[in-house]
Structures are given as C-alpha cells and as structure tokens.
Amino acid sequence: MTIKAILTDIEGTTSAVSFVFDVLFPYAARHLPDFVREHAGETEVAAQLAAVRAESGEADADVERVIAILLQWIAEDRKVTPLKALQGMVWAQGYRDGQLKGHVYPDAVQALREWKARGLDLYVYSSGSIQAQKLIFGCSEAGDLGSLFSGYFDTTSGPKRESASYARIAGAIGLPAAEILFLSDVVQELDAARDAGMRTLGLAREGGSLDGHPTVASFADILVE
C-alpha cells in the first residue's frame, strides 16, 4: 500500500537527543521555578499546577511543593503531561527571547522539505508537548519549518509504547494505518506502531539496527515509495 503520510518522532530521530537533554531540559530546570512563581495565578498555568497536584496525589500542595515535584519529575525524566506543558511554556519564552534555537538534523530538514513538496502529509508524535514540538520546528536553526507539518501529537494521544495510541493517531489523521510510515529510534515505539498496522522505519544514527524493523542511519537513506 502506498505511503501517504509520515509520522515522525523527534528525539534521536529528527533531532539530537543531546539537544533535549543537554539544552532544553537544563534550561527548563533553571527557569521553571521562577516561571511558576511569576505566573501561578494565570489560568493556563494554574490548570497545569492543578494537574500536578492530581497526578502526584498531593491535593493541598502549595506552589513551592509543586515546584519541588516538577523538578523531581525532570530529574527522573518522567513523561507527565502537566510537566511537559509547563516546560513548553518556559521554552516558548526562551525561543521568543532568542535564547533557544531548535536543533533539526540537516538530512531531516532536506527530506522533510522534499516529502512535503511531493505531497506527503507530515506529522509529529513526541513525548514532548505539542507546544514544545512546534517550537523546535518553528524556531529551528534551519528557520521556520512549522509549515511542513499537518499536525502534531503528544502524550494526550496516549503512551508512545502502546499500540492503541497509534491506532488513535491514524484515526485522527484520517488514513488507514498501513498508509502511514512511522519513524523512530526506539524499538518499543516501532513495535507499537507496527502492531497498530503502521509501516515502520528505525533511525539508528550511530549505526546498528533496531530489531525487527528496517533501519537507516540518516533521513537521506529513506526511500518512500
């Protein structure tokens, strides 16, 4: 069946894992406490703080306790939706201020542009919030790549290692799963996408293979039929 859409992961796939762990996460950890203190009374931020209290089971946590929980989640690399949303808000401020530029591999930039020009629909699925995804591509070192994408998906669509998440995304895209190619550097994510009926391709940028899936080292090596 012909591929009509491409769904791509970010970390380790379109972008260096080091950008997320060495640049974005430390930036959020440094700036998140003051950001929460300054904006805790705003509706959008307050909603996420309430979600932190619910997720942690600490309904009476004050702002300082919520900040401590968030910093602990960052240290543990927890994929928790309210944390991702708040990190996205902090990063948005950093991108607006010119302190951050999203990293996207040059081979990924070229391939994404070529696929878009060929009429393929491009989508992102990452554990980072949709807001954070848009910032990485919209404020990238290669310029604004946001217009290349038709949609973004995050953990609100479900965990990345569960096949139901990919079935849900295929439904949202409006295509049979078999017409969607999923790109990732994580075997468990590729397995889940395949179980949902998607085509899969692994990215192993340091070489090697991802068990049970076709694997390439660069977007330049991807042939979409």
From Swiss-Prot:
One of its GO terms (biological process) is L-methionine salvage from methylthioadenosine. It is an enzyme of class 3 (hydrolase). Pfam families: Hydrolase. Keywords: Amino-acid biosynthesis, Hydrolase, Magnesium, Metal-binding, Methionine biosynthesis. The keyword Ribosomal protein does not apply. Its EC number is 3.1.3.77. One of its GO terms (molecular function) is 2,3-diketo-5-methylthiopentyl-1-phosphate enolase activity. Binds 1 Mg(2+) ion per subunit. This is Enolase-phosphatase E1. It comes from Pseudomonas aeruginosa (strain LESB58).
